[in-house]
Amino acid sequence: MSGKLVLVTGVTGFIGAHVAEQLLQAGYRVRGTVRSMEKADELIRLNPGLKDKIEFVIVKDVSASNAFDGVLKDVELICHIASPFFVENVTDNKSQLLDPAVKGTLGILEAAQGVKSIKRIVITSSFAAVGNFQIDPHNNKVYTEKDWNPITYEEALTTDNGIVAYCASKKLAEEAAREYVKEKKPSYDICTINPPYVYGPPIHPMKNMDSLNTSNQIFWKLIDGSKEATPFYYYYVDVRDVAAAHVFALENAKLSNGRMLVSKGVFTTGDICKVLRKEFPNKSDVIAEPVDITVDPSFFKLDNSFSKSLGFKYHSDEECYVDTAKKLWERAEEFK
């Protein structure tokens, strides 16, 4: 156990909470940024095993200048996860998505520049920074870590598509981080983790089921009793694997200034319903009817072979679907 101190930004978020939990299991010490101590208290209430194990510090806005003043003392490694995720009701791409994502990422890099103890910053990016979301996805394209979303800043400013703007924010933030390291040559290096849709058990504070992360909202609609099984398929990864990738990347020499696409494969809403109806026959009244969905052979490919070549392993589809459903039903009971 190394006992190195890791700063986790956004520690009370969907991914951040899992990252903190896995860091502690791996023997690291964790300092987590929160917007309020109420959020920190709620995280501990939901996960009593984390009690007295995380040092919480308040950072109200990670994109504010000097947001990390006094937060980085003795830190050796950083997992920078906090970032906006608004897709609906975006009225100003620049102020709601682009600026916060870029400033939040550059802010942590700039703050870390003067802290010689920091050796690596692992940044939560996204497949959104990799793929081209302005073309038909049925294009036979194979995406790897070498690919970049081709959208420009100017296009991102003017698009009225919230999803395209969000994807642009992830691309621009990652691009800015890599440019910064290239130009400033800090004492640390960086690595990005690039997941597609992220499913998995939510262990973080939530206001209600409507505040689920965007991916899990799709999953919840399949099992919330509304029986809404909209035929849909896409690439996904378990949140526990996203968290494991952050921990994996912190001290892996092969990921110095690298990039790691993490994806289990393609899910279909029909497959999710089939697995869950088999596993939970007593829940058939709330699980949507499975719809047979064929994935078009021309649908783009997300190549995860680099992560596998490093020895990284993924949860099975069944583990992800079953564990996610159990936790979602459990959390729904909280809000009744």
UniProtKB/Swiss-Prot annotation:
Binding positions for NADP(+) per the UniProt entry: K39, Y166
Annotated GO CC locations: cytosol; nucleus
Pfam families: Epimerase
Keywords: Cytoplasm, Nucleus, Oxidoreductase
EC category: oxidoreductase
Highest taxon in the source lineage: Eukaryota
Positions of transmembrane segments: none
GO MF annotation terms: methylglyoxal reductase (NADPH) activity; oxidoreductase activity, acting on the CH-OH group of donors, NAD or NADP as acceptor
Family matches, as InterPro entries: Epimerase_deHydtase, NAD(P)-bd_dom_sf, NAD(P)_dehydrat-like
EC number: 1.1.1.-
UniProt keyword Transcription present: no
Localization per record: Cytoplasm; Nucleus
Gene Ontology BP terms: cellular detoxification of methylglyoxal
Family listed: Belongs to the NAD(P)-dependent epimerase/dehydratase family. Dihydroflavonol-4-reductase subfamily.
Designated name of the protein: Putative uncharacterized oxidoreductase C513.07
Species of origin: Schizosaccharomyces pombe (strain 972 / ATCC 24843) (Fission yeast)
